[in-house]
């Protein structure tokens, strides 16, 4: 069977060779960094391992373990004021500091992956070679192509995404090497290769799902000279350079968000059992598919369209305010507003807002989002039931995708999954490099907790 988009990969190896430089590759640089980091971790735990770092409340245990420090995640930390920081850098920092494609104003997600893994900003040449390396790995095995082609079109795109990634387990270099008895010191190297193989294949998988479910099933070819986001957009079926630039921004700002969210934690948990990157990421994608995690931007759009129909295009302050109060008084929330940690407007929202203002300030849905932004924080503050009345990233992302013709909101979580893979896989490589332990927290029954609480309270 001939698959058109696979043919171009024969050209990628020659592209890599002709564009190679004396600068270190990502794997070479990581191999220099991780032994130092691993030793630092060992020494830190040795010296301070008995230090108590937190008290846990019963309500936290029953409240989804919210706020309990119980995991290590190197790539990002969420600051209540500055928002997400990638290796210490804010959204504004990475937009300024990370390499960009020629003529683009947005950072390349490949550059962020380098930053997440090493803590360093790569050079332009290093990122271009990483882009080419990823695209050289994009070819799907025939059984995965056939599998996707045979899935029913009404099967949710996220289910198809997870199935395809799981089926790629057949290609796992780590699983094969582990079965042959490799040394623990080599775990990270095979995990690295699997992770880059998987990252390279994700745009093809995502685009194939989109073309199969929503279009005619036909796809173009991977372009070895194009960056990651451009290949993704082109394979989906668009040649709009502004859409490509949006996708660079989208993939970058959605790539990592600490390790406690469902997709990151699930992948970390499964990976701690030494499951391959394919199985680890697939588990996270299944978590991301849950409506409480990855469906938020789709729910925002559904709510916006309902609002738009209700107000008959009257976006005045009074009309918007009334609709917001009606939403809250009916026991519902305003989707896209509020955050568990942030106490100000999500910088990711602001980055997307600026993109919209620069490219389509008169787009009707954007004007509606802007009107809500002017009114909602005041309404939520007066309502008094949220600690953060400001918009988060989900309040905006779906509107931008709508503008560029990607109308099928059930596909949006697939794009979220492609993006989140950068952060998840960077941490998995790091976990294998430092010899992270398998997760095994303690659980109790409610009766046992009652007993514990009774004993504690009797001593007060």
UniProtKB/Swiss-Prot annotation:
GO cellular component: cytoplasm; mitochondrial matrix; mitochondrion; peroxisome
Active-site residues annotated for this sequence: 293, 339, 394
Motif (C-terminal peroxisome targeting signal (PTS1)): 458-460
Family indicated by similarity: Belongs to the citrate synthase family.
Induction line: Expression is repressed in medium containing both glucose and glutamate. Expression is up-regulated by the presence of C2-compounds such as acetate.
Gene3D superfamilies the UniProt entry points to: Citrate Synthase, domain 1, Cytochrome P450-Terp, domain 2
Keyword Kinase: no
Effect of residue 294 to A/V: Leads to a decrease of the catalytic activity and the ubiquitination efficiency
Domain of life: Eukaryota
Name the record gives this protein: Citrate synthase, peroxisomal
Catalysed reactions, semicolon-separated: oxaloacetate + acetyl-CoA + H2O = citrate + CoA + H(+)
Physiological role: Peroxisomal citrate synthase involved in the citrate homeostasis. Catalyzes the condensation of acetyl coenzyme A and oxaloacetate to form citrate. Citrate synthase is the rate-limiting enzyme of the tricarboxylic acid (TCA) cycle.
Localization in the cell: Cytoplasm; Peroxisome
Any one GO MF annotation of this record: identical protein binding
Other observations noted: Citrate synthase is found in nearly all cells capable of oxidative metabolism.
Gene: CIT2
Position of the Glycyl lysine isopeptide (Lys-Gly) (interchain with G-Cter in ubiquitin) cross-link: 218, 239, 354, 385
The UniProt record lists the keyword Cytoplasm: yes
Documented effect of changing residue 339 to Q/N: Prevents the stabilization of the enzyme by oxaloacetate and impairs the catalytic activity
Enzyme Commission number, as recorded: 2.3.3.16
Pathway info: Carbohydrate metabolism; tricarboxylic acid cycle; isocitrate from oxaloacetate: step 1/2
Residues with PTM Phosphoserine: 21
Post-translational changes noted in the entry: Ubiquitinated by the E3 ubiquitin-protein ligase complex SCF(UCC1), which leads to its degradation by the proteasome. Ubiquitination is prevented by oxaloacetate, suggesting the existence of an oxaloacetate-dependent positive feedback loop that stabilizes CIT2.
Observed effect of gene inactivation: Leads to glutamate auxotrophy and poor growth on rich medium containing lactate, a nonfermentable carbon source, when CIT1 is also deleted.
């Amino acid at each position: 069977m001939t698959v058109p988009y696979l043919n171009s990969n024969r050209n990628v190896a020659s592209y890599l060779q002709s564009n190679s430089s004396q600068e270190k590759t990502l794997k070479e640089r990581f191999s220099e960094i991780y032994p130092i980091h691993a030793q630092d971790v060992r020494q830190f735990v040795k010296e301070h391992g008995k230090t108590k770092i937190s008290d846990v409340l019963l309500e936290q245990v029953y409240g989804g373990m919210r706020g309990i420090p119980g995991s290590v995640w190197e790539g990002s930390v969420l600051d209540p004021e500055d928002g997400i920081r990638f290796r210490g850098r804010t959204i504004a920092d990475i937009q300024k500091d990370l390499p960009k494609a020629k003529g683009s104003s947005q950072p390349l997600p490949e550059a962020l992956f380098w930053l997440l893994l090493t803590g360093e900003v790569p050079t332009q040449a290093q990122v271009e070679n990483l882009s080419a390396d990823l695209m050289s790995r994009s070819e799907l095995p025939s059984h995965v192509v056939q599998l996707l082609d045979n899935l029913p079109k009404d099967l949710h795109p996220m289910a198809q995404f997870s199935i395809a990634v799981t089926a790629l387990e057949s290609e796992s270099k780590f699983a094969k090497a582990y079965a042959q008895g490799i040394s623990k010191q080599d775990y990270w190297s095979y995990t690295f290769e699997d992770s880059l193989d998987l990252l390279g294949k994700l745009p093809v998988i995502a685009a194939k799902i989109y073309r199969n479910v929503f279009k005619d099933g036909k796809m173009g070819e991977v372009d070895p000279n194009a960056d990651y986001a451009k290949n993704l957009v082109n394979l989906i079926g668009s040649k709009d350079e502004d859409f490509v630039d949006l996708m660079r921004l989208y993939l970058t700002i959605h790539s990592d968000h600490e390790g406690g969210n469902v997709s990151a934690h699930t992948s970390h948990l499964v990976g701690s059992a030494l499951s391959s990157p394919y199985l680890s990421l697939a588990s996270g994608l299944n978590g991301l598919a849950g409506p409480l995690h990855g469906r938020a931007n789709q729910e925002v759009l559904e709510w916006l369209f309902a609002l738009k129909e209700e107000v008959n295009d009257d976006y005045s302050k009074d009309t918007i305010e009334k609709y917001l109060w009606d939403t809250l008084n009916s026991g519902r929330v305003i989707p896209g507003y509020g955050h568990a940690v942030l106490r100000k407007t999500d910088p990711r929202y602001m980055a997307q807002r600026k993109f919209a203002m620069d490219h389509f300030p008169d787009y009707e849905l954007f004007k509606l989002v802007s009107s809500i932004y002017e009114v909602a924080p005041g309404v939520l503050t007066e309502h008094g039931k949220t600690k953060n009345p400001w918009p988060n990233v989900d309040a905006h992302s779906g509107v931008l995708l709508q503008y560029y013709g990607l109308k099928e909101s059930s596909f949006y979580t697939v794009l979220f999954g492609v993006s989140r893979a950068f952060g998840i896989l960077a941490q998995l490589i790091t976990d294998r490099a430092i010899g992270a332990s398998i997760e095994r927290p303690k659980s109790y029954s409610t009766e046992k907790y009652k007993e514990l609480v009774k004993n504690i309270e009797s001593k007060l």
